[in-house]
Amino acid sequence: MNETYAKECEIECIENGNTLNAEVDRFQKEKYLSVYMNTVKINLQYNTRNTSYIGKMAGLEFISKGPKLLGHHR
């Protein structure tokens, strides 16, 4: 069964606590998440310890729970 996910997700900067919406570029559940935030691409890898996607860009660390599941289809 296939799953459909949202095209946007929330991403939080760990250093300053700011939360932004980012456009999902590529996503594979529990593997990786690639997003565009204000035309800047950020790659996040899945972290099994806290079940989140974590990545770094320009000296800042970002965290996301990933895009929301919209539904299942065959």
Regions found by a protein language model. Name each.
Residues 1-74:
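Cysteine-centric segments in proteins
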